[in-house]
Amino acid sequence: MKKVLIIEDDSFLQGLEASKLERSGYKVITASNGGEAIKKINEPDIDIILLDLILPDFNGFEVLAKIRQLDHLKKIPVIVFSNLSEEKDIDKSKELGATDFLVKSNFTLDELIKHMNTIVK
């Protein structure tokens, strides 16, 4: 079973994502803010990270930079899943090591999961 860390401050959306991913065969752990995410990224056997950029304390860019600083997480795929859609946000995410950048309003959860499945085969 693949393990996903969902970093999302919107509790309703986090719940939807977690429920859908669990039904799709993922083991889910969640973080609601950057500080919580920084603690949870050290959990063993995380296969993929789903990261929102708009968080209440650290922003998603800071969390992504921290993830990529840790040797054991450098190769773990990080999908930025955010409502931010400006080119500068996409570029900055890629520069910091995001595997992909998906705009929430452009993808259903089913499409997101299909995309995740191709990444973590």
Give the predicted meaning of each segment.
Residues 11-29:
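Two-component/phosphorelay signaling modules centered on CheY-like receiver
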Residues 8:
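Conserved acidic carboxylate
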Residues 14, 56, 74, 86:
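The feature encodes the CheY-like receiver
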Residues 33, 59-62:
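Acidic catalytic/metal-coordinating carboxylates
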